[in-house]
Structure formats: C-alpha cells, structure tokens
Regions:
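Predominantly a Rossmann-like dinucleotide-binding segment in NAD(P)-dependent oxidoreductases
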Residues: 1-58, 192
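Glycine-rich phosphate/pyrophosphate-binding beta-alpha loops
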Residues: 32, 79-87
Length: 197
C-alpha cells in the first residue's frame, strides 16, 4: 500500500489543478508519483479498480483516490487525498514472511522547502528515525536504511538523454504505462467496476 497524503482543505492557487478538464484533479497531480513507483517495483497489473471522489467544499475536481492494482499473486493499493490529519505510513508491504512499514517518503521536497541546496554527500539522506522498519516472524523489528534520494540525478539523466549521451532512466513506455493506469482508474471510478489493464 502506497500513500501520498496531505492535510490541506484549501484549493490550490494553481487553477489548472482546480478547474475541470484534461489533466485536472489529484489523479494527475499526485497520482503519477505513486503509480510509477508501483509499476517500477511490480510491473504492469492485469486489472485496475479505482474510487475517486470530491471531498473538499466547493471543489470541482476529484481530490481523493484509491486505486487497486491487481496482479496474479497480490494487490497493490494506492491512495492520495487532502484530508489526512494524522500521517499514515507512506509505504506498507505485507507478505508471508513479514511486513515492511515506512512512515514517510523521500525527504528532498521538505529539504528544498526549508531552503537547502541539493548538493553534497548528505543531500537526500534520511534520519535514522525515518528509515523503514522490517518486521519478520521470530525476529525483532529492524530499521532498514534508505538510499539517498537524488532528484538532480534524474534531471542530469534527462539532460544527457537529450544530448544522446545516455539512455533515459524513465522510458516513454514507462510514461505510457502510468497513463494507462490513470485512464483505467478514471474508467473504473466512473463505471464502478474492475477494468482490464
């Protein structure tokens, strides 16, 4: 289960996010961030189910979604919304051998908001209390250090790809697959049924 939650009932000052039309709503704003993570980890699903709603007073676009990605051996739940006052884990993975819980995702956005520059070996490095925790049968919970986040490496790859010096880290097909999930989620929410991917 992946969450990208906020607590902010106010409308965005960016009107393209708040007016009905192509690319509007939370599915296009926060959705791609967790959809691409799920597809990167688990591949393309076989089916998609989604529930999207308008929860903020006066909103004209969906601002809450829950998507289920169906795989032969598992399901992956993706959620995002604006009314999560108490933080829930950003990542929860549960299986036969145990569970992995991570309370928050990458810290780079918070660091940028705090005015820090994306440079140096400590950039994107999490505090130990923010590491994920692995729980396994017969063992004590164990903190799992995260790799340092590095937005700049992504943009450097884009630059190098445009110059023909590297293959893109995110392919056109990756983007298309994320859009297929969004399209299936919108169709599912409208029809209230599971959609073939």
């Amino acid at each position: 289960e992946f969450h990208f939650d906020r607590y902010n009932g106010a409308k965005s000052p960016k009107m393209h996010k708040e007016l009905p039309g192509p690319g509007a709503g939370i599915i296009f704003d926060l959705g791609p961030h967790i959809i691409d993570q799920a597809l990167h980890l688990f591949g393309n699903p076989t089916h998609v189910f989604a529930d999207m709603r308008k929860t903020r007073p006066g909103t004209e676009v969906e601002d809450l979604f829950e998507i289920l990605l169906y795989y032969p051996e598992m399901r992956v739940r993706l959620k995002a919304g604006y009314y999560f006052k108490v933080p829930v884990p950003a990542f929860q993975l549960h299986g036969k051998l145990g569970s992995f819980i991570k309370t928050r995702s990458d810290r780079q956005e918070a660091d940028l908001d705090a005015g820090r520059k994306p440079q140096g070996d400590s950039w994107g490095q999490e505090n130990p209390q923010d590491y994920g925790v692995m729980h396994v049968d017969g063992g004590n919970p164990e903190r799992v250090p995260s790799e340092n986040g590095d937005f700049m490496a992504f943009y450097e790859n884009v630059f190098q790809s445009l110059r023909g010096e590297a293959q893109p880290a995110v392919s056109v097909l990756d983007g298309i697959n994320s859009m297929r999930v969004i399209d299936a989620a919108m169709e599912s929410s409208e029809a209230k049924k599971v959609i073939n991917y």
